[in-house]
């Protein structure tokens, strides 16, 4: 069974969706570790409740980001992880780390990339008068919220919507599409070849597939 590592910083709601997808067998893999860069991350409690080992790596314990990422990478190599899943990991990965695990790191971002990389995506979409928003699962490279896009899910923005309403709508889609993409990877259906995403041997379009 393939081994999955999940990196978190906060509540771990996407982590919970992935845990449940593994427990039901929807994802035919095993989460072997949950890593957090925040000691008070509630996601660590979710891991504990599911019987999943966890580790905390704090920036203050290392002389540089490079050293921290090297330590995390060495740990992941020691336990022979097949896939690294970023689930609300609010620390930018260093270039050596993304190169070391190229094609083995997935991230989910709360926008329809390439629109709205970075933070405050719901607020920015609302302020710009967008009629839709969404979420994107993509491979990770050294570019922030870059990397080949795999799958996107759209949500409507209605007149009078608040940021919180858009976020709730988007998160519900995240819990659907992230386990699905992880499933594809674990089943060897999804691959990154020369910085492009392929599913079942077919090159995905630049914005990935649209989840319906």
Model feature map: region roles:
Residues 36-37, 65-66, 79-95:
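N-terminal glycine-rich "phosphate-gripper" loop used for MgATP/nucleotide binding
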